[in-house]
């Protein structure tokens, strides 16, 4: 790591001035900082698995998992630990160093916690970093997950405080900040970013990044999502964001949070190779890899590796675990799955009913 001075006092007009730079100047500034901190040709790869899909009681206007919108999404119960580990092993074999697990909840409940903690500890035993996104967390829940070994917790701010009320009404901006505070206090790393292309103004994109950069400690990982418009959601007919505005957002995030991983997240399937290359040059150095991001499509793994080869990029290397370690973990998971099979109907429930 470099000795770049980190700031937590960014003014809104300073960030807007960065967005307004000529593109070449902005990219040069972002890339120069990026090279001082990171290997510019290394990309951290994460795999995201939906461990509980649909029937969420929240009203996020971008989200097909909300029970309030008819998007044709089939709701699913919390999946078994054994299946989670099978997916984690596949992700690791494909080059992922971090495995992220997401559930469509407002927040987890007490009966969920034993299963969630088992998922964390068993995935970690495979030599992977772990991340979860489960909605809001209390301080006690954050401590439990940290004790189980959870490395990262994702909870996005979504947009600026000023535009937030146009996106969601069932959870406040302060609720999100409180969850992030609980995560950090428990000793976990924070993963927090937002979504662009939701009809916001450029000032809102600056406002989102200002909130993230002015946290007491910058998020360790900053996912920047491009809105994926899903039929049946209130945002299905919004105009597309200019791709260069997305690249600008990546570049400004890199400049004001130079030590954070900046992740290309949702919407990457619609991006051209050239646009992705610009994002990597601007400072993006993390992606989600393969299949789906919870419910939206993502580029196939072989497409990503082909692009990496063309650009001379390489994945970050994960921790090593032996074949014997993997076998032991899978055997434990199978035994646990059999032990809880009779209780499954009570344990895995419809979150939308709560």
Curated annotation (Swiss-Prot):
Pathway: Cofactor biosynthesis; biotin biosynthesis; biotin from 7,8-diaminononanoate: step 2/2. Gene3D superfamilies: Aldolase class I. One of its GO terms (biological process) is biotin biosynthetic process. Its cofactor is [4Fe-4S] cluster; [2Fe-2S] cluster. The keyword Transmembrane helix does not apply. Disulfide bonds: none annotated. It catalyses: (4R,5S)-dethiobiotin + (sulfur carrier)-SH + 2 reduced [2Fe-2S]-[ferredoxin] + 2 S-adenosyl-L-methionine = (sulfur carrier)-H + biotin + 2 5'-deoxyadenosine + 2 L-methionine + 2 oxidized [2Fe-2S]-[ferredoxin]. Binds 1 [4Fe-4S] cluster. The cluster is coordinated with 3 cysteines and an exchangeable S-adenosyl-L-methionine. Binds 1 [2Fe-2S] cluster. The cluster is coordinated with 3 cysteines and 1 arginine. Residues 41-265 form the Radical SAM core domain. Its EC number is 2.8.1.6. InterPro entries: Aldolase_TIM, BATS_dom, Biotin_synth/BioAB, Biotin_synthase, Elp3/MiaA/NifB-like_rSAM, rSAM. Keywords: 2Fe-2S, 4Fe-4S, Biotin biosynthesis, Iron, Iron-sulfur, Metal-binding, S-adenosyl-L-methionine, Transferase. [4Fe-4S] cluster binds at residues 56, 60, 63. [2Fe-2S] cluster binds at residues 100, 131, 191, 263. CDD domains: Radical_SAM. PANTHER family: BIOTIN SYNTHASE, BIOTIN SYNTHASE, MITOCHONDRIAL. Homodimer. Catalyzes the conversion of dethiobiotin (DTB) to biotin by the insertion of a sulfur atom into dethiobiotin via a radical-based mechanism. Belongs to the radical SAM superfamily. Biotin synthase family. This is Biotin synthase. The lineage of its organism: Bacteria, Pseudomonadati, Pseudomonadota, Gammaproteobacteria, Alteromonadales. The gene is bioB.
């Amino acid at each position: 790591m470099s000795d770049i001075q980190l700031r937590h006092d960014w003014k809104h007009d300073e960030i807007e001035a960065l967005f307004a730079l000529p593109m070449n100047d902005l990219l040069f500034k972002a890339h120069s900082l990026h090279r001082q901190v990171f290997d510019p040709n290394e990309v951290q790869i994460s795999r995201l698995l939906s461990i509980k899909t649909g029937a969420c009681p929240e009203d996020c206007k971008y989200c097909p998992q909300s029970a309030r919108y008819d998007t044709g999404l089939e709701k699913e119960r919390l999946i078994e630990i054994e299946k989670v580990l099978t997916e984690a092993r596949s992700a690791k074999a494909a080059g992922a160093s971090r495995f992220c697990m997401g559930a469509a909840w407002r927040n987890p409940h007490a009966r969920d916690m034993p299963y969630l903690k088992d998922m964390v500890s068993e995935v970690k035993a495979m030599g992977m970093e772990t991340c979860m996104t489960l909605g809001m967390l209390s301080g006690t829940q954050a401590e439990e997950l940290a004790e189980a070994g959870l490395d990262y917790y994702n909870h996005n701010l979504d947009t600026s405080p000023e535009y937030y009320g146009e996106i969601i009404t069932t959870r406040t901006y302060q609720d999100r900040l409180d969850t992030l505070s609980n995560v950090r206090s428990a000793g976990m790393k924070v993963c927090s970013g937002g979504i662009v292309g939701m009809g916001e103004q450029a000032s809102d994109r600056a406002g989102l990044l200002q909130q993230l950069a002015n946290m007491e400690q910058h998020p360790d990982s900053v996912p920047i999502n491009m809105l994926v418009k899903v039929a049946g959601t209130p945002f299905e007919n919004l105009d597309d964001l200019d791709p260069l505005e997305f690249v600008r957002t990546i570049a400004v995030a890199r400049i004001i949070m130079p030590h954070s991983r900046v992740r290309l997240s949702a919407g990457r399937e619609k991006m051209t190779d050239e646009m992705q290359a610009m994002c990597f040059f601007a400072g993006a150095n993390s992606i989600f890899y393969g299949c789906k991001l919870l419910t939206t499509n993502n580029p196939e793994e072989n497409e990503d590796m082909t692009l990496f080869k063309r650009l001379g990029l390489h994945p970050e290397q994960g921790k090593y675990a032996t074949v014997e370690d993997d076998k032991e973990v899978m055997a434990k998971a199978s035994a646990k799955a059999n032990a809880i099979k009779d209780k499954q109907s009570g344990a895995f429930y419809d979150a939308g009913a709560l």
